[in-house]
């Protein structure tokens, strides 16, 4: 292919009449234009290559996904026995047993009761993780709550008992070994609503390095037979896998109420769930380095079987705070509040007679709302007085409504 000569190119000047300087200037201008065009074309080429690479990656991904979708599904089975002749497996669903050969490498990974994936010819393809209900796994708290013992007031004796029952066996097990006693296995917190039972459990989770697994008793109540019991088994299995661990069961009366002669299927399923919980708490399987905390507002409803020593060794009452406790709780909840110097916590504690910790927190929040309503950033003593009167009035109205519908 021949290159164009100067005579063949459309020159930006008249070659017969233009001077030498005009020719040079015109050619320089043409060169600048061509360089700009070349730069633009180079950028477009880079963009096109990048776009092409992106589509190429997408094509490879879709091809890989298409290949996976066309693969035959694998069946789930359980290893029954490992023999010299091979591995005996039982398929899930049809309970069909089969003897299959495995490689030496795969044989080392297998053990009885292990879950495996098998193909159409019942050859073991890979080992699967243990079957654990995902609902039990999501109950594990990854991040410690921000509640500490300093955030709890008026419960010094209860805090000491909880720490002895839960924290010390996890942090200093050698002390119990030297004394020659088994550490307490569980603690039950009971008392009126709003007295700080859940906060005590949160403080334990914050203080210990153990895995903290939280759940409500109502989460274990299920419609179909065996679901609640299975969730209890999986819950303790998750705790064993993450030892040391603390299991907190809130509102345990939902599954541990006194057994009756009721013949309804719902009551029977709740009782089966409780039986599984009792078996896990003191069954033949070693529970290991796992501590249990439970909380309830209805101690009178609990079944005696769950209260015996060995299941819950400590039954700790969490009462409403006394006057000194109420003063401390007021100080705790107002630490970050912009309170005036005229606020008298002793007088507030006397005023809020028979109030729970939750009531006091509500009073502090309502006092702040009164200040905001008056477009103030400082909270006065009168705001707390008005807040207490409002909380009392709301409680009185709720009582009247409940009586009307009783």
UniProtKB/Swiss-Prot annotation:
ATP binds at residues 194-199, 333. GO terms for biological process: proteasomal protein catabolic process; protein unfolding. PROSITE patterns: AAA. Its main location: cytoplasm. Homododecamer, in a proposed two stacked hexameric ring configuration, but may also form homohexamer. The hexameric complex has likely a two-ring architecture resembling a top hat that caps the 20S proteasome core at one or both ends. Upon ATP-binding, the C-terminus of PAN probably interacts with the alpha-rings of the proteasome core by binding to the intersubunit pockets. Interacts with SAMP1-MoaE conjugate in vitro, but does not bind to SAMP1 or MoaE alone. Interacts with NcsA. ATPase which is responsible for recognizing, binding, unfolding and translocation of substrate proteins into the archaeal 20S proteasome core particle. Is essential for opening the gate of the 20S proteasome via an interaction with its C-terminus, thereby allowing substrate entry and access to the site of proteolysis. Thus, the C-terminus of the proteasomal ATPase functions like a 'key in a lock' to induce gate opening and therefore regulate proteolysis. This is Proteasome-activating nucleotidase 1.
């Amino acid at each position: 292919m021949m290159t164009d000569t100067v005579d063949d190119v459309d020159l930006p000047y008249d070659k017969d009449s233009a001077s030498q300087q005009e020719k040079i200037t015109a050619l320089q201008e043409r060169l600048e234009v061509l360089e700009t065009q070349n730069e633009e074309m180079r950028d477009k080429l880079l963009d096109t290559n990048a776009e092409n690479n992106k589509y190429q990656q997408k094509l490879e991904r879709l091809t890989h996904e298409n290949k996976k979708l066309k693969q035959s599904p694998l069946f789930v089975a359980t290893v029954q026995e490992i023999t010299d002749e091979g591995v005996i497996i039982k398929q899930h669903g049809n309970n069909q047993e089969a003897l299959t050969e495995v490689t030496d490498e795969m044989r080392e990974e297998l053990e009885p009761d292990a879950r495996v994936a098998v193909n159409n010819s019942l050859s073991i393809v890979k080992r699967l993780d243990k079957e654990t209900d995902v609902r039990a796994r999501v109950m594990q708290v990854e991040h410690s709550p921000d509640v500490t013992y300093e955030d709890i007031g008026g419960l010094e004796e209860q805090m000491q008992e909880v720490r002895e029952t839960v924290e010390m066996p996890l942090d200093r097990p050698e002390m119990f070994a030297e004394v020659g006693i088994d550490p307490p296995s569980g603690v039950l917190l009971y008392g009126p609503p709003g007295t700080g039972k859940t906060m005590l459990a949160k403080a334990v989770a914050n203080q210990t390095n153990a895995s903290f697994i939280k759940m409500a008793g109502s989460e274990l109540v299920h419609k179909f037979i065996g679901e609640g019991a299975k969730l209890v088994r999986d819950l303790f299995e998750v705790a064993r896998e993450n030892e040391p661990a603390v299991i907190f069961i809130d509102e345990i009366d939902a599954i541990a109420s006194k057994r009756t002669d009721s013949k309804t299927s719902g009551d029977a399923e709740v009782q089966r769930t409780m039986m599984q919980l009792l078996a896990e708490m003191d069954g033949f399987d070693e529970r290991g380095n796992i501590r249990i905390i439970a909380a309830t507002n209805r101690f009178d409803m609990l079944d005696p079987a769950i209260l015996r020593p060995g299941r819950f060794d400590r039954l700790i009452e969490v009462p409403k705070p006394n006057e000194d406790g109420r003063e401390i709780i007021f100080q705790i909840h107002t630490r970050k509040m912009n309170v005036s110097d005229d606020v008298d916590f002793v007088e507030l504690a006397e005023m809020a007679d028979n109030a729970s910790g939750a009531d006091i927190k509500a009073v502090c929040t309502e006092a702040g709302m009164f200040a905001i309503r008056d477009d103030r950033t400082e909270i006065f003593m009168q705001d707390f007085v008005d807040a207490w009167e409002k909380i009392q009035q709301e409680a009185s109205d709720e009582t009247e409504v409940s009586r009307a519908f009783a």
